[in-house]
């Protein structure tokens, strides 16, 4: 990309956890999506997650009854879950997981303050925006952030040496710690706990709020943005599954286009 600096565009950005993670996953995807501003195409896995999110949002807003959720899931699956399908056994596994979750669905154990709550806040000198899936409160006035996840996370093992799943959980928790900045700025208090509703495996994870991890997550966000600001060459991180099934801008990616043409030639 030569000596052209995109810093003026980056300096004007409003940040989010997903924007930072796009860069960490593939700098070139960040470039295509947030600098070139290409529209994303539908992908199976992301649209599946969005569909479940939508069903839960409609339930908590009173637009969908509990007994209607499973029927709506089955009737609208083909319309709502779009993009290139993986192999049929994988599609069926996702359908079965959705059915299992909705058949045994239980509302969250905290009174709802808001669902899909839009938050605008600041970390250091940087503007942020986010959407909290569910903000709840218990009988003592403690706040809880709940994030709906299609990823199959596991509760913390509490082993002396963290497991791979523990490290994955800590990585995912950064998002909720960043959202906690918005809660502190709006309500003047921090959440009591951060929770993941893992709807594919039916696991509900509750993590007590850790102030050290909170500060570390804020610093991670600032350091990540500074790294992006200093980036001149947004290089691609090529990985077939992610490029083909996850990346929403792969139709505009010269590296993915070249790779597909190479596969066709062979």
Model segments located where?
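Nuclease catalytic cores
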Residues: 20-62, 116, 249
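A residue-level signal for conserved active-site and pocket-lining positions in enzyme catalytic cores
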Residues: 26, 52-53, 134, 179, ...
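A short beta-strand motif that forms part of the nucleic acid-binding face
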Residues: 36, 149-152, 198-200, 211
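Hydrophobic (often cysteine-bearing) scaffold residues that line and stabilize catalytic clefts
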Residues: 44, 48, 94, 172-175, ...
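A non-catalytic, helix-rich entry segment at domain boundaries
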Residues: 54-117
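Non-catalytic protein-protein interaction segments used by genome-maintenance enzymes to assemble
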Residues: 117-176, 180
